[in-house]
UniProtKB/Swiss-Prot annotation:
Main location per the UniProt record: membrane
Disulfide bridge map: none
Family: Belongs to the oxidase-dependent Fe transporter (OFeT) (TC 9.A.10.1) family.
GO cellular component, one term: high-affinity iron permease complex
Protein name: Uncharacterized protein AF_0154
Source organism: Archaeoglobus fulgidus (strain ATCC 49558 / DSM 4304 / JCM 9628 / NBRC 100126 / VC-16)
Topology in the lipid bilayer: Multi-pass membrane protein
Entry's localization field: Cell membrane
PANTHER family, per the entry: IRON TRANSPORTER FTH1 (PTHR31632), PLASMA MEMBRANE IRON PERMEASE (PTHR31632:SF2)
Alphabetical list of InterPro entries matching this protein: EfeU/FTR1-like, FTR1/Fip1/EfeU
Example of a GO MF term: ferrous iron transmembrane transporter activity
Alphabetically ordered keywords of this record: Cell membrane, Membrane, Transmembrane, Transmembrane helix
Length: 277
């Protein structure tokens, strides 16, 4: 259960954002007396989820056709891409007015326009989720699927409850806390992707002082504290822990984490004193 926490946090955050956007859209339509258009919001949502499954399947099939060094390069690029999109998403969401954005877009009277709005809202989050989860799915497919499913279920439940109780939960606090968690996860992905690239370069005979080990805890893979073990695996997913690291990985990982935590804190300010989303 604990080893899937990273995947669960990702889908909880992304799924919650998507579910909240759709829930606000549906509530706005009902409040505006446009109940006959609610089904179009659901049509758009279903189409977006289907598109997400198609993209995920294509990624898995593409990875399955790779071998050796190609897989390492794919994992490295997938990790870097996930970090890039994740970074953009965290900072972009910091300044969003969820309710206001949805209601402005929903003012259009075209029914299929409502479906398109819902599709755009959801497919963006679905694609981001697929990108974020790809490195995890490559390493542990079953754990990733279970963790992602659990996160999505919790996200949908939270979105419905929050809408029903009229935003009594502080959404800014929620997004602030999950942004901090995601910053640690993204830093770990950056480190993992860097490690894969280092391995490829070393196999090609390329050497550099930064590729040398910055530290090694001397932990055997059979030890639960190893990053492939039970306890170490949890820490690896959630916080980017590894039993050993190259200098370049350590520098990039810690540098990214420090920069992101600073930007997140600056973007949200003193969360307890800020207005809710």
């Amino acid at each position: 259960m604990l080893k899937m926490m990273g995947q669960m946090v990702i889908t909880l955050r992304e799924g919650f954002e998507a579910a909240l956007l759709v829930a606000v859209l549906v509530a706005y339509l009902k409040r505006s007396g446009r109940t006959e258009e609610v089904r179009f919001a659901y049509y758009g949502t279903i189409a977006a989820i289907a598109a997400g499954f198609a993209i995920a399947t294509a990624v898995i099939v593409a990875y399955g056709g790779l071998h050796g060094e190609q897989k390492e390069l794919f994992e490295g690029f997938a990790s870097y891409l996930a970090v890039g999109v994740l970074t953009y998403m965290i900072l972009w969401m910091a300044g969003k007015d969820v309710r206001g954005e949805v209601e402005r877009r929903a003012e259009a009277k075209f029914k299929w326009g409502i479906a398109l709005i819902a599709f755009v809202f959801v497919v963006r989050e679905v694609i981001e989720t697929v990108l974020f989860l790809t490195p995890f799915a490559i390493a542990e497919f079953t754990t990733t699927v279970i963790g992602a499913s659990a996160g999505a279920a919790v996200a949908i439940t939270l979105a419905v409850l929050i809408l029903r109780f009229e935003y009594r939960m502080s959404l800014r606090r929620f997004f602030y806390a999950t942004s901090v968690l995601l910053a640690f996860i993204a830093a770990g992905l950056l480190g993992y992707g860097t490690h894969e690239f280092v391995e490829v370069l070393e196999e090609e005979g390329f050497e550099h002082p930064l590729f040398e080990k910055a530290y090694s805890l001397g932990i055997d893979e059979s030890n639960p504290l190893h990053h492939k073990g039970l306890i170490g695996g949890i820490l690896a997913v959630m916080f980017g822990y590894s039993a050993s690291m190259e200098w370049v990985r350590l520098i990039l990982q810690l540098g990214y984490l420090a920069a992101m935590l600073g930007l997140i804190h600056r973007s949200y300010g003193r969360v307890t004193e800020r207005a809710e989303v």
